[in-house]
A protein has these predicted regions:
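Acidic/polar, glycine-rich intrinsically disordered N-terminal extensions of enzymes
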Residues: 33-111, 115, 119, 139, ...
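Flexible, glycine/charged-enriched surface loops at secondary-structure junctions
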Residues: 138-144, 181-194, 239-260, 328-334, ...
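A structural-propensity feature for long, helix-poor, extended segments
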Residues: 139-168, 339-401
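Glycine-rich anion/phosphate-binding loop at the beta-strand->alpha-helix junction
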Residues: 225-237, 245-246, 251-380
């Protein structure tokens, strides 16, 4: 209260000591002066106090700034409070469109896939690929592994053989000390899989790690893994201090943390058909297949192309990961690391033609969860999970991988046939019209006009201006 009193006193004096015009816009000099002042205790302010401070400190029209923030608040106070408590210093909700891509056949089962994304044409491309492959046997998927990783990083300056002997006696103590943390996970069939001592001193002086593998079943497992790792670190330090073979401060734990690189948590997704089945209007099946293979080969050897190639895959993956309440940043980091595992960044997808059978596939690491986190808190995440039939983590891995493969197929198909802009810009047309503040009649006329014309921003501007003049 004392702080708030001082803060309010500062605001009052500030308004008294500065001249403002009668318009809602602050004079430039005043805004510049207030922008240079820091604030302490911001997190302790109420939500209303936070947004008032932001509006009056950073915006030339505070009333408008407040109005925009509040326009996106939910009318249901309990639902808004739920969103407010997801993160810190929440001031409003940031909307992304939630779309769906129907008609995905995965292992002979039909799915409608939820996709949360702001980029136009992604959902349409996924839907188109789903229909294309649905008529050709659908997508086939296999989970190749679900092992997740965490590490205790530490330094050791003593004799390596002493450390190796010490670790052999330490390992069972690490597991027993973490028993209270792993009991419930073990009842469900998960838990600690392996703990290995890794010598990294050739890469960095005195650097060692405990490299630990876990099975977390339907949980993404971040909290479980990190809790186990911190217990391992505590046990490691305690046992080293009590071992006469170690000198004081000879072993020092640096940090304990899970890894988002999970090369043993892999899912494979693929499609295949006879090359003749790839034929469509004005497209020869074999020619298309051979050109498609060449496009994949280019992305395999050329990092500049591979980055954009894989970004397109992640358009599909991220959209489903986000819609299902999973951590898309973790997935992105792990997938891109996997794409560079050979030492050069390369394509995540592969293609082949064998005995006239075209096969297109991808193997990627996906550490996902269907319990915990936002999966049971966010109403739209729960809705998305039910839309998918409340899948297990293994099933969700397969669905997400298929979304990425479908997206990549659609993109490479467009690139090697009509070009990417034709389809993308038609989907982007509505965004351009909204930027130009087109009314419903103008939108309808413009959409009709560009059904047979190439869509560019300048062409749309010219057409709208012609309508209005």
């Amino acid at each position: 209260l004392r702080y708030l009193s001082k803060f309010h006193h500062f605001i009052i004096n500030h308004y008294k000591n500065h001249q403002f015009s009668t318009s809602p816009y602050l004079c430039k000099d005043d805004k510049t002066q207030r922008m240079t002042q820091t604030i302490t205790g911001f997190s302790k302010l109420t939500k209303e106090e936070k947004i008032n401070w932001l509006a009056n400190t950073h915006f030339s029209n505070p009333t408008q700034a407040l109005s925009i923030l509040k326009k996106y608040w939910n009318d249901d106070p309990k639902l808004q409070q739920l969103h407010d408590e997801f993160i810190e210093n929440t001031i409003s909700n940031y909307y992304l469109p939630l779309g769906v891509a129907p008609n995905f056949t995965i292992n002979d089962k039909l799915y409608t896939i939820p996709m949360a994304i702001e980029e136009s044409s992604v959902v349409a491309a996924a839907s188109k690929a789903a229909k294309f492959w649905g008529d050709r046997g659908g997508f086939k998927t296999t989970v190749l592994g679900t092992t997740k990783v965490g590490q205790v990083h530490f330094t050791y300056t003593g004799d390596k053989s002493v450390l190796a002997d010490f670790f052999n006696t330490l390992r069972p103590k690490l597991i027993s000390d973490a028993a209270s943390l792993t009991a419930n996970m073990e009842k469900r069939g998960g838990g600690i899989k392996t703990i290995m001592l890794v010598d990294k001193t050739e890469q960095l002086a005195h650097y060692y790690q405990l490299h630990c593998q876990f099975e977390t079943l339907d949980a993404m497992g971040a909290n479980f893994i990190n809790s186990c790792l911190e217990q391992f670190a505590s046990t490691l330090e305690r046992e080293a201090e009590n071992d006469a073979r170690f000198r004081q401060s000879e072993l020092s734990v640096i940090m304990s943390i899970l890894s988002n690189y999970v090369p043993d948590c892999i899912v494979r997704a693929e499609v295949s058909c006879h090359v003749d089945q790839l034929a469509e209007k004005n497209i020869n099946g074999r020619e298309f297949a051979e050109k498609f293979l060449q496009a994949i080969a280019i992305a395999t050897v050329e990092p500049y192309r591979a980055v954009t190639h894989n970004k397109g895959i992640m358009n599909g993956i991220d959209a489903v990961v986000l819609a299902t309440g999973n951590d898309f940043r973790a997935v992105e980091a792990g997938v891109h690391a996997y794409a560079a595992r050979s030492g050069q960044y390369s394509s995540l997808t592969n293609a082949s033609i064998t005995d006239d059978i075209f096969t297109f596939w991808m193997e990627i690491p996906l550490a996902l969860g269907t319990v915990g986190g936002l999966t049971k808190l966010h109403p739209l995440v729960k809705w998305s999970m039910e839309l998918l039939g409340n899948p297990s983590a293994r099933e969700l891995m397969q669905i997400v991988a298929v979304a990425g493969l479908a997206q990549n197929f659609a993109a490479v198909k467009s690139l090697t046939t009509t070009g990417i802009q034709q389809g993308h810009m038609k989907m982007h047309l509505m965004n351009i019209l909204n930027q130009l503040e087109a009314n419903p009649t103008e939108k309808q006329q413009t959409v009709t006009h560009f059904k047979t014309e190439a869509v560019t921003h300048s062409a749309v501007v010219t057409y709208i201006n012609a309508l209005r003049n």
